[in-house]
Amino acid sequence: MRTKYCGNIRIIDLHKSVILCGWVHKIRNFSQFIFIDMRDWTGIVQLVFEKKNNKVFTKAVNLKNESCIQVIGIVKKRNANNNNLDTGEIEILVNKIKVFNISKNLPLDYSNNSNDDIRLKYRYLDLRRSELLENLKIRNKITHLIRIFMENKNFLDIETPFLTKSTPEGARDYLVPSRNYPGNFYALPQSPQLFKQILMISGIDKYYQIVKCFRDEDLRSDRQPEFTQIDIEASFVSSTKIRNLVETLIKKIWLKVINYNLNKFPKISFYDSMKRYGSDKPDLRNPMEIVDISDIVIEEKVASFFQINLKKKNRIALLCFGQGNKISQKKIDEYSNYVKKFGAKKLFYIKINKIENRFQDIQSSIKNILDKNTLENILRKTNAKNGNILFLLADEEKIVNKSLGMLRIKLGNDFIFFKKNTWKPVWIVDFPMFKQNSDGKFSSNHHPFTALKKNNQNKLEKNPNLAISDSYDLVINGYEIGGGSVRIHDAKIQKKVFNIIGIEKQFQREKFGFLIEALKYGPPPHAGIALGLDRIVMLLTNTNNIRDVIAFPKTTSANCLMTDSPSKLKKSILNELGINILKK
């Protein structure tokens, strides 16, 4: 049907006859000549229709953008090159044309980003954009690289079930009713976590899978209800071994896809990350760090001014921003209101005009409560310079960390004082085993199958809130790319963890009985990780929305506008499944 792809024709093909298939991208009618940019998935080539060839010229006149055609023609040299096209040195003089289908008038405009809902409804048209097509090609390249890498490391690609048991894993499950067992439901997996652990118990030494996962949760620009995970698990390995494997894989992907050499990934503990960056997902391109000055500004002396409750675990800390000369009082007020969203009472500042003059040339909302010695110590600890501004908070530790962490991100976005096209991966390790809710109850920080860090066994018994897990997240430029851990491989410890997070024994048997039973038959030590493929592709294609790297994504309300799903079912089908819909 064709002898060449549109984007592959070059000057070396001059005077050759070619057969091309594709879509009408753009039409320009000059009375005696019609020029058409023809497109397929490799690129664009210019077609020329001469009026003296009346048969093909007449057909060309009636064409519309996005009509699907086949042409036969001779490769000619252009009078003037088009340097914007790979095929810009040549054009095709058409002598035959076959019209497969004329397109309707388009509901979207390719020249600009049309309404998102329109783009998703007509996704088959949206996917004809070169940008989206290129994203899917890059996605394909990444998955190909992953498979080759994992095969070379002797990992087995093993599929795990999509119809499985509903287990509490944090988010809500998507449920599938069983026709054969009325009133019973399968769940679509949020991850293959339990199955991959069972595979390790089964003696499968190394497993991986590029797999769809499902979570019925509120969406945002980097989340979808169905997403793709690079799932990895191995027996008789440490957390270091898994991190080294993944680091090698990520470095290979970045090198092969965008020709970028990543440096060795630093490792930061969860507690250090929260203290230094106010986040467990720090963007290390931003050089600012939170500086603790609790040792300089005595809490008891300033408690009244800062409205600190001395009975709580407090922190006094600040950010040193280098472009203070760009920060107006209006901007300071804006940032003060911004941090209130995260529980902060008031944002204080110290603006340094001439550091040589110390106290005289400093503007500050707390100048009256700082003596010269305290101020000197603050300037010394922050290494502040002329033109810097210090943003200071004093409050509960969690509030200070969160508020200054978010302010750090906002300052980075507002002033972009770091290189955008650089990459800063980091491992965040040693997360707390549990989170304690406001009612005092515990929940798992990662998931309840995460193993304790060495020498934390006693804490599990006596102080669960102090227990540290052998866990790790990979963060790149502020995005969490993946998370993993060493797994519990002792049935007794697994039961203890379930007890701590409030899963009753009966519920343990119902939901996790198969795992606990399997853990009684000589399970090996094992560890693993899950990486978000969609987020990796999103980063490498420099897109802001995960929808742009998925062929058929959902909206932020989990709708597919193209197929109009989810949709209602006939009463007869619901009756067969034993389902009665209650009206809200």
UniProtKB/Swiss-Prot annotation:
* Binding residue positions for L-aspartate: E169, R215, H446, R487
**Residues that bind ATP, according to the entry?**
R215, D216, E217, Q224, E480, G532, L533, D534, R535
Q: What is its EC number?
A: 6.1.1.12
Positions of the UniProt region annotated as Aspartate? 193-196
SUPFAM superfamilies in the cross-refs: Class II aaRS and biotin synthetases, GAD domain-like, Nucleic acid-binding proteins
Q: Top enzyme class of this protein?
A: ligase
Q: Which residues form a coiled coil?
A: none
The record ties this protein, via InterPro entries, to: Aa-tRNA-synt_II, aa-tRNA-synth_II, aa-tRNA-synth_II/BPL/LPL, Asp-tRNA-ligase_1, Asp-tRNA-ligase_1_N, Asp/Asn-tRNA-synth_IIb, AspRS_core, GAD-like_sf
Q: Which biological process terms from the Gene Ontology are attached to this UniProt entry?
A: aspartyl-tRNA aminoacylation
GO CC aspect terms? cytoplasm
Main function: Catalyzes the attachment of L-aspartate to tRNA(Asp) in a two-step reaction: L-aspartate is first activated by ATP to form Asp-AMP and then transferred to the acceptor end of tRNA(Asp).
Q: What is this protein called?
A: Aspartate--tRNA ligase
Q: What species is given as this protein's source?
A: Buchnera aphidicola subsp. Schizaphis graminum (strain Sg)
What is the taxonomic lineage of the source species? Bacteria, Pseudomonadati, Pseudomonadota, Gammaproteobacteria, Enterobacterales
